Every structure is written in C-alpha cells, then in structure tokens.
Amino acid sequence: MTTTRVLVNDIELPTATTHGGGGTLALLTLDNGADHKIPTTLSPDTIAELTGVLLAQRARAQAGEIVALAVTGKPYVFAAGADLKRVSQVRDRDQALALGRDGHAAYSLLADLGVPTFAFINGVALGGGLELALACSYRTISGSVHAVGLPETSLGLVPGWGGATLLPRLVGIEAAIDIILTKPAANRQVSSHEAALLDLVDVDLDPADFLERSIVWAAGVLRGDIVVQRRELDDAAHWDAVVAAAKTRLD
C-alpha cells in the first residue's frame, strides 16, 4: 500500500519595493512517492500526519515564524480523495464516525491556524482533496486541471469532510447541487476554467510555472496588493426548491 505523506518546505516570499511584505510560507506537499498513475489519496494515517503537521505549523504561526501556509500535491495530482480501500474496511458505526471526525478535526485546523492558508490546486482534486482546498482561505488552480469535484454520491457516499456545507457557501446552492449530485451522476467533473467562473477558486494560473505563480500571487494577497472579492450569496430561500428540482432530475 502506498501511503500519502505530508512534506513540509519553507518558502521565502518575494517582497515588493513599495509595500514590503515577504516572510516565510510553509508549503505542504501531499506525495505518495509514486507517479501520477497512482494518485495520492487521504488515508487515516495521512490525516493523522496532516493533523500533526498542522499543529506544528500553528505553533510556528503563533511564534511569528511563518506568515502563511499553503498545500499542494505531487505533479498532476492535488489529492484524489479518501483512500477508498481503507473506507471499505470500515465495519461499524464507531469506525465510520472516527473517520469523519478525524478529517473534520484536521481540516478545521486550517481555519484556526492564525495565518492565511492557500490551496495550490495543481492537479486532480476530488472528494476529500477538494474539501481540503475548500478549508483553506484562498485557492489557486492550474489551467491544465480537468477533474475537480465531489463524486462521492456516485459511490453511495456523501461528502464527509465539510464539502456539503463549505461548497454552497462559496458557489451557491444551485452550483453546489450540480457539483455534488448532478455531475457525478453523469460521470462529469469541473475543469479549472469552470472552477474559476463559479468562484470555486480565486484565480486560474498558467500551468507552465504554476507553483511559482501561485507563490507570487499568495505574496500579493498577503501584502494587500491583491484583494480577493467574494460574492455575497443570498440564496437560502431557494434551497428547498433547488434540492427538490435535483431530486426530480435524478429520479
């Protein structure tokens, strides 16, 4: 079994002559040591390691050692979701609850880190991989990415690490229903271009030097040179109607 590890590197951010800036960004890379034919997945062991890494980075943030944290993946893959082999080994309710709670606890640390967090989506981001990106403050995506989504419902599962609540808050209930229910039923996902149009990500960057551009973009956000505008969503009154329409289409 190939276990995804969480590798940490410190990146010194570029400064601007007019606004200063700089500082250290902790870059976390999800990597299982194999090529893209074996996508990185998130096993309970990976989630436990991620939790430990994030706790350590939170302590560094409190000490003023880092000004931001970013998560990315190995070439062509951000993260392809939970390790389904391990999920299939769940035998009782307590194990299922532990799996969900551990993922929630790890991802919640991103919101409680004390510094801005970034997801540099360099490749496939599905299920728990997309939920990891949603838990971050900001998201960049490579223009070559063609598979972003929450396909769990096609397997008889639900997004269990926050996607079902975080996604509609970001893109609205109609787009969220499409990503969570309609697209998986048709075996379709979201491309980088669609993700940018939906405001699922904040910026779509050239894949040729995606990581470098993402770091420069993050530095601009931290300096205040780049201001990310988020839509004000007021669609609570439409939730029931949208969900009912989706049920009708899928029945």
Q: What are the residue ranges of the model-derived segments?
A:
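Gly/Pro- and small hydrophobic-enriched strand-loop and loop-to-helix capping segments
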Residues: 137-160, 164, 173, 199-214
